[in-house]
Each structure stands twice: as structure tokens, then as C-alpha cells.
Design a protein with these regions (language model features):
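N-terminal glycine-rich anion-binding loops that anchor highly charged ligand groups
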Residues: 10-21
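Internal helix-loop-helix
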Residues: 20-92, 130-137
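Short Gly/Pro-enriched turn/cap motifs at secondary-structure boundaries
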Residues: 86, 101-104, 128-131, 143, ...
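A gly/ser-rich beta-alpha-beta helix-loop segment of oxidoreductase catalytic cores
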Residues: 92-114
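Flexible, small-/acidic-enriched active-site or ligand-binding loops
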Residues: 108-110, 157-174
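A short core secondary-structure module
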Residues: 119, 123-164
Length: 174
């Protein structure tokens, strides 16, 4: 079992199964793909996933974190575009806060953004970002020159967006 767990690249093979049981954003409204379960039920679901394989629980938690961020802070168009696909597992999300040398301390964040004519330019590096190598979309955090923080939904196909492939990562299986 140990050698199989080490060579498995990612848990993508079980994404559909997690989606089918409401493992992604289950507390969100049904019109966005959620199942409107309460937070206690969601917590119990995470506890059971954790009992089997912590990395699978992380997949569900990170996906739900991305979904909750879009649900709480995104526009109606962004919610309609991303949430149902994240809930169904069609898209895998990643949450980009942590940075080299600073971890997840927003006050030390070096990633920055600027507003151009019709878009934002985001520059910086992130580190320790769960599921970044397999994500289709990421919520990336950065700050402006005036220290105004913002989250950006970045699709994998966006020019300049890249992630490193992590091979044979034991992570939570160690």
C-alpha cells in the first residue's frame, strides 16, 4: 500500500466520487451546486474523510475554501461560471495565499497587483499551495502599492500562470 500511495500523482481519480456525495462546497446553495448542508454536517463529513486519507480531506477542504471565497466575494457572473463546475468536480480549485519566506502572513505578502485599462496585472510567487499542480482555477491573493488586498480568480490557461509539478509527495500520508 505504501509504495502505491507514494507514486499516485494526485487524487483526481476520486474527484467525481467526492462531488457526488457533496464533498465540495456542500454548505453552498443548490443553485451553485451545493447541497445546503449545515456546517456541523460538513465538519463530520470532513472528519470521516480524514479518517480514511487526510490528503483526500484536504482536496475537499481546499476545493470548498475556493468555492466559499468565490461565493462570498465573487460577482454573480463569477459564481455562475465557477461554482457549479467546482461543485461537480469538473474544475479543481487551488487557494494561493502562502508565499516563500512568509507563509500565510498577509502583512508580509510580496505578491502585488496593479490595475491596467481593462484588466489587473498580478505578479508574485506562491508556495505550499494545495493542489496547485492539478488545479484548473486558482484564487490568488495579492496587494496593491497602497496595501489594499484582493483575491483574483486565475484560470490555468492565463498567460504567465504556472505551477511546479510535485512528484512522489507523501504529504499527509506520511
Amino acid at each position: 500500500v505504501g509504495s502505491e500511495m507514494c507514486i499516485r500523482d494526485s487524487p483526481k481519480d476520486i474527484v467525481k466520487k467526492l462531488a457526488d456525495i457533496g464533498g465540495f462546497g456542500g454548505f453552498l446553495p443548490t443553485n451553485y451546486g451545493g447541497s445546503e448542508i449545515d456546517f456541523t454536517s460538513y465538519g463530520l463529513m470532513m472528519q470521516e474523510l480524514e479518517r480514511g486519507d487526510s490528503s483526500i480531506r484536504v482536496l475537499s477542504s481546499v476545493q470548498s475554501l475556493v468555492m466559499n471565497t468565490i461565493y462570498s466575494l465573487g460577482s454573480d457572473d463569477q459564481k455562475q461560471k465557477y461554482l457549479p463546475k467546482l461543485a461537480s468536480g469538473e474544475l479543481i480549485g487551488s487557494f494561493g495565499m502562502s508565499e516563500p519566506n512568509h507563509g500565510s502572513d498577509p502583512s508580509s505578502m510580496k505578491s502585488h497587483y496593479s490595475e491596467e485599462k481593462d484588466c489587473y496585472i498580478v505578479n508574485g510567487s506562491k508556495m505550499w499551495i494545495g493542489h496547485a499542480p492539478i488545479c484548473d482555477v486558482a484564487v490568488i491573493w495579492a496587494k496593491s502599492k497602497s496595501n489594499k488586498y484582493a483575491g483574483f480568480i486565475v484560470e490555468r490557461s492565463t498567460e504567465g500562470f504556472s505551477t511546479a509539478k510535485i512528484e512522489k509527495k507523501w504529504s499527509f500520508r506520511a
